[in-house]
Regions:
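Short regulatory helix/loop adjacent to the ATP-binding pocket of P-loop NTPases
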Residues: 195-213
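Short glycine-/polar-rich loops that comprise or flank the Walker A/P-loop
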Residues: 60-64, 184-186, 211-214
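Alpha-helical scaffold elements adjacent to nucleotide-binding pockets in ATP/GTP-utilizing enzyme cores
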Residues: 52-53, 78-85, 175, 197, ...
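P-loop NTPase nucleotide-binding core
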Residues: 40-44, 48-153
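A short, basic N-terminal segment
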Residues: 1-36, 41
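Conserved small helical "lid"/interfacial subdomain of P-loop NTPases
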Residues: 218-233
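Short, basic/glycine-rich phosphate-binding loops at helix/coil junctions
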Residues: 1-9, 113-124, 153, 209, ...
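Conserved Walker B catalytic segment
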Residues: 124-194, 203
Length: 233
């Protein structure tokens, strides 16, 4: 049976409705290299909005990297996800990704694995650890790549509140802010599903990420904006 509506997951294309103003605003922020914080309760369409904007940006000199860090439990879990996502999204094919690892992370030997599903992407394990790379080196990786390739990178991190749940979280946040605030070829879109944690990270004056970027709060889509979609189905 065909589903007329999709619930509980990010959507694209004709299943994405309204958010016209938010889409235009976020697209402009991405194009102008602005840091953006998206805050809202669960299932308000943050991920779908970011995907929509990514699909609408046609400038080949802007690369949008999306990653979800929900299952990252430690600082170096995050660095491995961060680096792998950036290397994959700034490459056109797997072979180029591996070449970029050799070029930008020379002390690593990546491991590639494939899913049995024919349309699934490959996964890459980098093995980043305190023994081979410092946090600052990994956090500055996108700036190094962007300068080398002559592009601007927009890094979109979903479930960013996980950073606040990690051991020694405050030190991690200070390291991130300390590196990211000086980058000129990279901007960030940070969002998550736990509003109270995100609000504390970005709106608490005592926290390292206070005033890191423009904060946008997504509200529920109004009833009048739902009507055209419902009638069309």
């Amino acid at each position: 049976m065909e589903k007329h509506f999709i619930y509980g997951m990010s959507v694209e294309g004709e299943n994405f409705t309204d958010r016209t103003r938010e889409t235009q605003r976020l697209k402009k922020d991405f194009e102008h290299g602005m840091n953006v914080i998206l805050i809202s309760p669960r299932r308000m369409g943050k991920t779908s909005l970011v995907k929509k904007v990514k699909a609408e940006i046609s400038d080949p000199n802007i690369r949008i990297v999306m990653m979800d860090i929900y299952d990252c439990r430690s600082e170096y879990d995050f660095y491995n996800r961060f680096a792998a996502s950036i290397l994959k999204e700034t490459s056109n094919k797997m072979e180029q990704t591996l070449e970029n690892v050799k070029k930008f992370l020379v002390r690593l030997t990546p491991k590639i694995s494939f899913s049995p599903e024919p349309l699934s992407e490959y996964s890459m394990s980098l093995g980043i650890s305190p023994e081979n790379y410092t946090p600052e080196e990994i956090l500055n990786l996108p700036e190094v790549i962007a300068k080398e390739k002559g592009i601007h990178i927009v890094i979109c991190i979903d479930e960013f509140q996980q950073i606040g749940e990690m051991p020694d979280s405050l030190s991690i946040q200070k390291r991130m802010r300390g590196v990211w605030q000086h980058q000129t070829h990279v901007s960030y879109c940070l969002y998550g599903s736990k509003k109270h944690l995100m609000t504390n990270l970005f709106q608490n004056k005592r926290m390292p990420f206070y005033q890191f970027g423009e904060t946008n709060e997504l509200s529920a889509i109004s009833t009048q904006d739902w009507v055209p979609l419902i009638q069309s189905r």
